[in-house]
Amino acid sequence: ATTEIYTLSLHDALPISPQQYFVDPCKFLLTTPGINATTGEYSDFGIPASILASFLRENGVVPEKSDLNSILFLMTPAEDHAKMAHLITQIARFESFVDDDAPLSEVLPELYNAHKERYKGYTIRELCQEMHDFYKSVNVKDLQKAMFRKEYFPRRVLNAQEANYEFIRDNVELVRLSEAEGRVGVEGALPYPPGVLCLVPGEVWGGAVLQYFLALEEGINLFPGFAPELQGVYIEEDEDGRQVAWANVLTHERETELLGKAL
């Protein structure tokens, strides 16, 4: 099978060459069950990669990143047979835990003890199923795909430099992301993974990008201990104990001055 290589520059993706593929010997990428490789549709049961990543970290293996149903390891020339054997052993242990539907307290003791009230009585398959069903309900894989397709790119009303100047001059306000529809972002918004800017300063919050970040916010509240790293979007706990996403946007007054009207 062949694929294409893409170079990404903010919101511009161009194919380098058709029928060209490249394998990076320093990257070891695994996929976890949950998405049909032929149809691209969600299966009935899945194992979100973040759960496997948490298990590996609790057992001395640190993945570079995990996202939905893929997990990435970075290899170096210093990796030896013992390290690779340890990785394989831990993945096989996790598989056995899933097959046996072991108690979550046994599979992920550190995470379980940190969030015992939330996960009390859970088994590993229950957690996998619940998280998989959540991703399926919000169709997060298609949201992630849409964010990097030209027809779904956010509308740009200022160039990134202008928006950054407004941020430095503090012509901004911090708003709940749930109320950011139509507001001009002044910081680059980036979830890691994938580690690529989804909203560039000067672009308007909305569409797939906003829906994706709101899905992440909901996931953070539903599954404590599995929060992704976010840049340009800030998570703070409100008075009810809910984790709320916030973002800096251009003030309405400054929008009117720069654009002739508030968006």
Predicted regions and their residues:
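Non-catalytic terminal extensions of PLP-dependent enzymes
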Residues: 1, 8-263
